[in-house]
């Protein structure tokens, strides 16, 4: 099958794994994540690819090149290639779920 079709909201809510790859193609990867309360993805940089992230559930912060941005349900983050970034779950109670 070419392409990938899913109910991304349902897949994100249901995911309990830190990182689960749903689909990979030559130029794109679809991943759902669940970050435990107080957890983070860890600072990283992708030299040659931009990233798009969307928060489905929870509260957190995005840190892009040292600048912090508050996040909650429905927020999206676009991370340009070469940008140091981290996503942190600021809740003490619920997982931060995103794709």
What are these regions (language model features)?
Residues 1-29, 42:
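A short, N-terminal "cap"/entry segment at the start of jelly-roll beta-barrel domains
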Residues 20-24, 33, 41-46, 88-90:
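Short histidine-centered beta-strand/loop micro-motifs
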Residues 29, 52, 59-61, 68, ...:
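Structural motif
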Residues 30-32, 98:
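Hydrophobic residues on conserved beta-strands that form the core of alpha/beta folds
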Residues 34-36, 45-62:
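Short, conserved beta-strand element in jelly-roll/cupin
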Residues 67-81:
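Short acidic-glycine-tyrosine-enriched beta hairpin
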Residues 82-99:
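Ligand-binding loop in jelly-roll beta-barrel domains
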